[in-house]
Amino acid sequence: MLNERSLLSQFLHFVAATVASLMVFSLYSIVDGLMVAKGVGEYAMAAVNLAVPFTNVLFSIGVIFAVGTSTIIAIYLGQNQGEKANSLFSQNIVLLTCVGLTITVLVFVFLEPFAVLLGAKGVTYQYTIDYLRGLAPFALCFIISYNMEVLIKTDGYPRLAILTVITGCLANCVLDYIAIFVLNLGVWGAAFATGLSQLLTCIIYLRHFLGGHNTFHFVKFRMDWGIYKRLIPLGFADGVTELCNGVMIFLFNRVILRCLGDDGLVCYTIIAYVNTLIINTMLGISQGSQPLVSYHYGKGDAAGYKKLLRYGFTAVGIMTAVIFAGVMIFAPQIAGIFLGAEKPELLGSAAGALRRYGLCYILLGSNILMGGFLTAVEQPKAAISISVGRGLAFQAGALLLLAAAVGGTGIWFAPVISEALCAVMAVWFLRRFLRKTAA
C-alpha cells in the first residue's frame, strides 16, 4: 500500500488527491443549488438547502465507517495482517448496504413529517418534498460512494479516487442540466440526477475492488460486532464534522427564518454551499494524511507521524490564507453566482453575511486537522470532543445566544466564536498527546 517514497512526496500525493476529491464532491450539492436557482428560482434553492441536513447524515455515516475502517485497515497492513484487513473491508460494505436500504424505506414512509421537521413550509414545502423524493432512492449510493472513495486511497490508488469523483461530478452536471432545463423536472429532477451520478461512482469503485489489482478485497467473513467498539469512535470524529454541519444548517435555517425571513434563508443557503466547499477542503488535508499517520503510528514511528503533522499545518495555513482572502475580497461575486444582479439588495445582504460568517475560516482548518490527527493516532475521545465542540456545542450555543441578545445580522458571528473556543481545546489535547509520546 505505502511504499518507501519520501514522506513529503507521499503526503502531497495523498492530500492533493483527497482535497481534489472532496472539493469535487462538494460540487454535487453546489451544482444542484446553482442550477435550481437559475432554472427554478432562489426560493427553490432555499428549499434544497432545507434538505441538505439529510445528505449530511448520509455522508456522515459514510465518513464514520470510512475513516474508522480505513484507519484500522492501515494499521493492520502496517502490522502485516492482510486477512484481517480483507475481512473488515468486506464486513464494512455489507453492513453499510443494509443501513442505506433501511434509510430509503424510512424516508419514504415518513416523507411529509420529515420535510416539516427540516423546516419546509409555505413556498418551500413542495420543493422540499420533491427534492427528498428524488434523492431518497439513492441513500445507499451516497453512503457507499464516499466510503469506497476513502478506502481506495487506503488501498494505494488515490488517483483512481479523484478520477472517479470527477467523473461522477461531470455526470451530475450534465444530468442536472438535462433534468432541469431540458426535461423541466424541477427540483425532483435535480435530486434524481445527483443520485444517478452517485450510482455511477459506486459502480466504478466496485469494479476496482472486484478486480485483481487491489491490496484488499471481498472475502467471506464472520460478523465481528466487537470491532465497532474500536471502529466507530475512530471514525466518529470526522463523521461528526459532517453531521454537525448538517445539524448547524438545520439550526441556522430555523433561527434565520425566525429572525431574517425567507430572504435571510436565501443568504444562508449561499453561505452553506460555500462553507461545505471550504470544510471539505480542510477535511481533505486531514483525511488525506490520516492513512499515512496511522501507518507510521502502527509501525511505532513517532518521528514520521509528527513530521506529517507539521506538513499538515503548513498545508492548512496556505489554504486558509487563500480562502480567507478570497471570501473577504470576492464575497459579492460569490453571491452573484447564485443570485445574479437583478436583486441588488439581496445580493448586498448575502455578501455582507458571507464576510461576517467567513471570519471563522481563520481557525477552521487547524481545528479540523488537529481532530483528524488525533483520530489517526487512536485518540478518539479527544478527536470527538474537538469535532462536537467546534461543529455543534460551541456553535449552537453561540448562535442561540446571539439570536437572543443581538438578533438580525449578529447571528453570522456565531461560527467565529465557536472556532476560537474549539482552538483552545484542540491545542490542549494535541499538546497533551505529544508530551505523552515524547516521554
Model-predicted segments: where are they?
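Short alpha-helical transmembrane segments in multi-pass integral membrane proteins
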Residues: 1-18, 73-140, 182-236, 293-360, ...
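N-terminal transmembrane alpha-helices
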Residues: 2-40, 53-68, 72, 97-104, ...
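Residue-level signal for transmembrane alpha-helical positions in Major Facilitator Superfamily
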Residues: 12, 16, 28, 65, ...
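Transmembrane helical elements of multi-pass membrane transporters/channels
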Residues: 13-32, 134, 145, 168, ...
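Helix-terminus/linker motif at the lipid-water interface of multi-pass membrane proteins
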Residues: 27-46, 115-122, 178-185, 246-277, ...
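Membrane-helix interface/capping residues of multi-pass secondary transporters
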Residues: 33, 42-45, 82, 111, ...
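Small-residue-rich hydrophobic transmembrane alpha-helices
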Residues: 45-105, 142-161, 267-331, 364-386
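Short runs within selected transmembrane alpha-helices of multi-pass transporters and secretion channels
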Residues: 66, 135-153, 164-169, 190-205, ...
